[in-house]
């Protein structure tokens, strides 16, 4: 992984070695990572739609939303397009999360269908996660079983504008929106507006255990996204 000084939020891994590689932004994918792969004769499995420059690889494109929806800033869309092209040029095989995306990727990027596989989103790992009730220490205004819960970023396609509008129409109700709030790729208007809704609480990043606690104790789970790869 690219070691840029930020903390890693990972569970205990027994059979996977974590290798930090010092790199500055795009040099990681363009220079540092390919050099490491060649040196160790390694096969690359890219799970985050990252740009790559090695043919011994498979890549996951969760979806290609930035190419079909106008919800991102121009530079992010250009960067994502370049990532997709590098996947087309170098990856031996591509995986995505639905048959809908499989056909869309083939249509938009010109990748043959027989080169694109489908691996559905997983949830089974949560069965072995213990709920971490300490998350409520960060939410003193939230009562168990009396709030509505949503999880994700504040990116435009997640449609959290809908949650904010519903919260504004129901000031007696409580809402919790967990997840990252970094809108560098989307602009700050949504974040500024969201912070002005007093009955919405933002715990920020939550662990799997904290997420499970919030899901188990909410009155209802909200998922207003208009695009998730299916």
Q: What is the predicted role of each segment?
A:
Residues 1-230:
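Carbohydrate transferase catalytic cores enriched for Leloir-type hexosyltransferases
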